[in-house]
């Protein structure tokens, strides 16, 4: 019986994990917070020993050390691979001038998106601490991307660097806008700040999508992922598809390719 692969996506906000079976299906999933945010360790006690761990880590050395300690405590000696972006892998060609500068999370997400939507031109918008946009052609060529502050970071920056504006979280902002989303302009400061930053996200995406469709002269599927996707989606006027497992799905493909080469 083939052992599953343990997949770990360590982002700046939290850490997601999954077990993938031989068919690259995610059969068990979970998430946990960073130590700095009071996040408890994951409960892996009921999981079988995997073939190995494949890790995308954009959260730094301290998180890498924590993951090593967690893996060693549960499965001593477990092989592990921290992925890096490459010039080409799993049907995706990296268009960055220096391919290894592309974040490993974005690289895995591109691979996952290519597999999820084969033969389609894609604009992939991922909403985390940063909002990232990736342009992926139907033949698997990643032609470039955009990086902007995420919704939460935009609001936090305004609250931190101005004297009279509040510092709002996405939970607070989402609640404020729940009954006011239909109105293009707001009548108090917290809602104005929440909506302004949200529309900045939506405006970036819609401009990028239209520019891409014009440049490629072809239909482009807009794919949304990440924690603020629901809120941003409500501000969009474009059709879109939601997919929240692109990075883990891409890691599953990378793991399967690596295991086949062992």
Curated annotation (Swiss-Prot):
Family annotation (CDD domains): ASKHA_NBD_PanK-III
Pathway: Cofactor biosynthesis; coenzyme A biosynthesis; CoA from (R)-pantothenate: step 1/5
GO MF annotations in UniProt: ATP binding; pantothenate kinase activity
Cofactor: NH4(+); K(+)
SUPFAM superfamilies the record matches: Actin-like ATPase domain
UniProt-annotated location(s): Cytoplasm
UniProt-annotated binding residues for substrate: 96, 103-106, 189
EC supergroup of this enzyme: transferase
EC number: 2.7.1.33
Residues at the catalytic site: 105
InterPro entries attached to this UniProt entry: ATPase_NBD, Type_III_PanK
Keyword ATP-binding: yes
Gene3D superfamilies (UniProt xref): 3.30.420.40
Catalytic activity, reaction form: (R)-pantothenate + ATP = (R)-4'-phosphopantothenate + ADP + H(+)
Textual note on the cofactor: A monovalent cation. Ammonium or potassium.
Function: Catalyzes the phosphorylation of pantothenate (Pan), the first step in CoA biosynthesis.
Family: Belongs to the type III pantothenate kinase family.
Subunit-structure text: Homodimer.
Protein name in the entry: Type III pantothenate kinase
Name of encoding gene: coaX
């Amino acid at each position: 019986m083939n052992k599953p692969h343990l997949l770990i996506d360590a982002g700046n906000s939290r850490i997601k994990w999954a077990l993938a079976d031989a068919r690259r299906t995610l059969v068990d999933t979970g998430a946990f917070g960073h130590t700095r945010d009071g996040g408890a360790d994951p409960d892996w006690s009921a999981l079988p020993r995997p073939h190995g761990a494949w890790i995308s880590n954009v959260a730094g050395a301290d998180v890498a050390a924590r993951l090593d300690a967690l893996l060693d405590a549960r499965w001593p000696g477990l092989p592990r691979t921290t992925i890096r972006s490459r010039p080409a892998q799993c049907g995706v060609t990296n268009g960055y001038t220096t391919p290894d500068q592309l974040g490993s999370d974005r690289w895995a997400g591109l691979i996952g998106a290519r597999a999820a939507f084969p033969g389609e031109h894609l604009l992939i918008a991922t909403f985390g601490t940063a909002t990232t946009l990736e342009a992926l052609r139907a033949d698997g060529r990643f032609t470039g991307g955009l990086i902007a502050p995420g919704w939460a970071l935009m609001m936090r920056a305004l609250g931190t660097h101005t004297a009279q504006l509040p510092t709002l979280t996405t939970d607070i902002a989402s609640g404020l806008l729940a009954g006011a989303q239909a109105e293009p302009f707001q009548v108090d400061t917290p809602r104005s700040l929440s909506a302004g930053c949200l529309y900045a996200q939506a405006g970036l995406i819609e401009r990028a999508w239209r520019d891409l469709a014009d440049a490629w002269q072809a239909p482009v599927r807009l794919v949304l992922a990440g924690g603020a996707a629901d809120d941003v989606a409500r501000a969009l006027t474009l059709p879109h598809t939601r997919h929240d497992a692109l990075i883990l799905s891409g890691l599953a493909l990378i793991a399967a390719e690596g295991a086949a080469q062992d």
